[in-house]
Amino acid sequence: MLEPKKKMYDKSGPRVAAALQKRNMEAYYCPTAAEAVEKVLELIPAGDVVSWGGVATVDELGIKGRLRSRNQPVIDRDTARTPEERTAMLHQALTCDTFLMSSNAISEDGQLVNIDGIGNRVAALCFGPKQVIVVAGMNKVAADLDGAVSRARHIAAPANAQRFDGKTPCAVNGQCGDCTSPDCICSQMVITRFCKPAGRIKVVLVGEELGL
């Protein structure tokens, strides 16, 4: 990352964290990925059952491996042997102790914007797990809510369509087609503007470019 952009992130990150805190979320700014990983692990009690959405940022940071190395109980849908077992794990994740995810976008005034295909990730964000830890690079931050929605729809969603190899217009040409195709990954769009109960959602902002 170019040094001027890093300086910008380090100056704006604490301000975005403060905006999230005003909306009843716990929020932390970590200048580096390494510091962010340690903060996430610190926030997860040893006995918690942990699960996650399909989250590139958590994979990029190696958090799953760190959890396994300390024998953390996890619900990992990728270990399912059948479609039925995978679906059961998706349901189990909704009642886990700690759910890990990123956010498709975050507005500077502290609102989270997330788009989901089947809705399991945004369902967990809204209700179910005892706590939700959102880990997001500062590249996810947009100036305002309209910008955050635009980022989620026109940057994150087309990139995720490439990741999931779906048959959607954005998977073909890289641009949102506002589609209703069978493989559409934009079934649900959730804006989180306030957290109840207070502190259930914890956001770890990272002064690096992570995820999609």
Positions of PLM-derived features:
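Glycine- and acidic-residue-enriched helix-capping/strand-helix junction motifs
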Residues: 1-10
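N-terminal start-of-chain detector that recognizes signal peptides
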Residues: 1-2, 21-24, 71-74, 85-87, ...
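Flexible, glycine/proline-enriched loop segments at strand-loop-helix junctions
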Residues: 3-4, 77-80, 132-139
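Conserved phosphate- and dinucleotide-binding cores of soluble alpha/beta proteins
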Residues: 94-212
